[in-house]
Structure formats: C-alpha cells, structure tokens
C-alpha cells in the first residue's frame, strides 16, 4: 500500500479574474472547473490539478471541511530542461520579475516568480531532489 502522487495543490488568491488570466493565458494551463466567487481549477499535465481558491470563501465549511491559508504560498511546476531559457524570456517579456534562479547541487534548475496574489511559483527542470522527472 503506497501513496502514488500528489493529485492537487491549493493556492489561495485575492482576485480570481487576475488569477485565471495569469495561469490560463500566460502559463497556458487549461481551466477545468470554475465557481464565481469561490475558485478556478487548472489542469497541470495529465494527472494534476492546481486549485486556486478565494481565501475567504474556503473558511466556511459546506461540502468540504473549512481550509485556507494566509500569506503567500509556494508550489513548483515541472518543465523540460531545454524550455528553461524560453520560459525566462517569456516571463521577462511580460514584465514578470524572475526573483531567483537556482542551479541545484543534485541537478536541475529553478526559476522563481510571483503570481498576481504574490504566491511563489517555481518552474523546475528534471533532476531536482534527485528524483525522476515523471513528466
């Protein structure tokens, strides 16, 4: 009996429209679910979902238990190594500041930037953590 994967990751945002524009239009993630005033969900790869919730909308329980966070969160999206330069140029071309670029001791590289709410988004190439990429 083993856990196989992380299926979904939640981030908490303050503007769903700006969040949808950023992730759908800019990063190219397809929208797979949306409830105005509550959330927008994006497909990431073949088997993962990024859940973007309005923070205050998740504090009251309904179908799901209450959840949420305050302050910026962090998550990483996997990219191919040869796409790193293209992503850097795309980010900079859209006025998105690359906060940090890291070459990891075990292998792989990361670019860090912020979404419209201030969440830390990382684009990471295979080799980080010494694990196979899986993408």
What do these predicted regions represent?
Residues 1-17, 72-77, 127-135:
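N-terminal beta-strand motif that seeds the catalytic metal site of vicinal oxygen chelate
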Residues 2, 88-135:
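Vicinal oxygen chelate
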Residues 12-57:
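Core segments of cupin and vicinal oxygen chelate
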Residues 18, 82-87:
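Short, conserved charged micro-motifs
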Residues 36, 73, 107:
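Exposed loop/turn and edge beta-strand positions of beta-sandwich/beta-sheet ligand-binding modules
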Residues 54-59, 127-129:
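A short, sequence-level motif marking secondary-structure junctions
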Residues 61-65:
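Short beta-strand/turn micro-motifs at beta-sheet edges
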Residues 67-70:
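Short glycine/proline- and charge-enriched loop/turn segments
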